[in-house]
Amino acid sequence: MIRAVVTGAGRLLGALILRHLFNSDGIEVAGAMEREGHPLVGTDIGEIIGMGRTGHIITDRFTMTAREADVIIDFIPHETDLKYLRMSAERNIPIVIGTSGLNHNELITVVQSSARTRCILVPHMGYDDIFAWAAIRAAKWIVHQKKGLYDLQDIRGV
């Protein structure tokens, strides 16, 4: 079973991805992250996604949460995305990054970091539900790949 940590757990897309993870085969929730000081840190994710208590508490401690992860699903603003990308690369944890666009410097960081881990870029397609399922599908796929940078074109047919 693949264990996924989701960042931005207190946001709409984070909650949607978490809800879908509970209904997915072959992948499960290992943890949920939010930025330091977010009001939902310490909250059970089930309370946010309407499932009751799940035992998974939102944290702002990447190092502790990452110990449980086979993959990180990260789709919060770029500055934070790239922080988690660098941290994932240091620990060789694959990462799925949801994005609506990266500038030149951000793309350089992605390319450099993906040399040390596996990274897949998932563009936000405008439909949150489609994006959430694409992110989960990408997370299940990326853990079996060699180090490098990938995009959704690479997992077509999976």
Predicted segments with their positions:
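Active-site-lining helix/loop region of Rossmann-like oxidoreductase modules
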Residues: 2-35, 53, 67, 115-116, ...
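Fold-independent oxyanion-binding glycine-rich loops
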Residues: 9, 35-36, 61-62, 75-76, ...
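Alpha-helical hinge/cap motifs
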Residues: 11-14, 77, 92
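Short, charged/polar "capping" segments at the starts of alpha-helices
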Residues: 37-43, 103-106
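Short, aromatic/basic amphipathic alpha-helical patches
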Residues: 44-47, 109-111
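Glycine-rich, highly charged phosphate/nucleotide-binding loops
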Residues: 47-64, 73-81
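Short acidic/histidine-rich motifs immediately flanking catalytic phosphotransfer sites
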Residues: 66-73, 90-95
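Rossmann-fold NAD(P)-binding glycine/threonine-rich loop
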Residues: 79-91, 97-120
